[in-house]
Amino acid sequence: MRKKVGIIGGGASGMMAAVTAAGAADVTILEHTARIGKKILSTGNGKCNYTNRTLSKDDYYCDHPSFVAHALSQFDDQAASAFFAAHGMLTSEKRDGYCYPYTGQAATVLNVLRMLLEEKGVTVKTEQKIEGVTAGKDGFIVKTRTDRYRFDKLILACGGNAAPQTGSDGSGYALAKSLGHTLRRPYPALTYLLTKDPACKELAGVRANALLTLYVDGEKVQMEEGELQLNKDSLSGIPVFQLSHRAVQALAAKKKTTISVDFLPQLGEEELLHMLTELQKQYRKQPVEEVLALFLNKKICGALLHRLSLPFQQEMQTVSDKQLKKLAKLCRHFVFEMSGYPGFDKAQVTMGGVPVSEIDDTMQSGKVRNLYFAGEIIDVDGRCGGYNLQWAWTSGYIAGLHCCDQENVSENRETERESR
């Protein structure tokens, strides 16, 4: 007799779990919004960066990296690309290993999954607000505002708190807790960072390639290079997103959090000083601002001069050697103190969730038999660049595969958790 598998959450991980399980079970997705897969449509600026060719466990934040490594060994970036290619989606690979549908439209990825669900006979129930889940010897009872369902196996793929406008409202956390699981406090990740530094106001609108270094209580923590976007009260752009996990953790813990910006990462400090010295000889009578603008955005020039209290129109020949050294140093170490971070509505993913120490390598709960987890509800979050969607595919595939096994409880589950 075919088992009944219920999946709470119709996002990327829930749909992958459903497609995987559908061949061996009767699968029902319960989605609390009016449509499935809404968050997929906003990924990659609407282009859906669905995985990354540089994939490794080091691209994820997780208390037990071996958990992620084992999961990726079962379904990695090549498996994800092969899956979509096998179902008709042409793909393209961009810089840094970013992979997209060839159409450049996130809807293509969603349509593959949506059509597969229909072809495989998966029942999709939308607008199902979950009111409670009860686990018993005979399976699970899921109560919604309008219906009552019984399942032999249950997969929680409810997502996190990030981007609540797409349906990710954190409701799955309460369900996990009601079934005996603990929770790592959720925080926004892959987000911009706030600052009260007045320099941001004059730098608003600037985009510049830069090397960013995150310091927490004076200790260097992480470095990222890419296009920095400066706004009137925040730093943004991919390098900031990459720093945001550790920065948000530090800010939440009330630690001093600063980001040092190198506006000329292609030059060493001595090389830059030599260049400034030569330019001083060449343009003796020219305003220092105009000379700096030969290689820096003019707004950046203004911020540098303001911070050093140098007049914009001061002639280069009157700038002292000491001032030139300070200018060279500031170009490569322009420090912003961060004051906070925005809410979940401005974040791409959630850090925190159900600890992996409570989940085995089949994505099954270590507390409740036949309960599985997939996606962002698990305390695993990745870097920007397709890694979080890959985690959705990976964890969804593993949960969907193993929830259909006749004997799906690992006898070594306790050993697995203790070894991580």
PLM region descriptions:
Residues A34-I36, L41-S42, Y50-K57, T182-R185, ...:
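An anion/pyrophosphate-binding glycine-rich loop and adjacent beta-alpha core
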Residues N45-E93:
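Glycine-rich active-site loop/strand segments that organize a redox cofactor
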Residues T126-G139:
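A conserved short coil-to-beta-strand element within the FAD-binding core of flavoproteins
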Residues K3-I29, A399-C404:
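N-terminal Rossmann-like FAD-binding beta1-loop-alpha1 element of flavoenzymes
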Residues K153-A199:
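Glycine-rich loop(s) and the adjacent beta-strand/alpha-helix scaffold that form part
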Residues A22-N45:
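Glycine-rich FAD pyrophosphate-binding loop
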Residues G6-I8, I130, Y149-Q165, A176, ...:
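Short hydrophobic core segments
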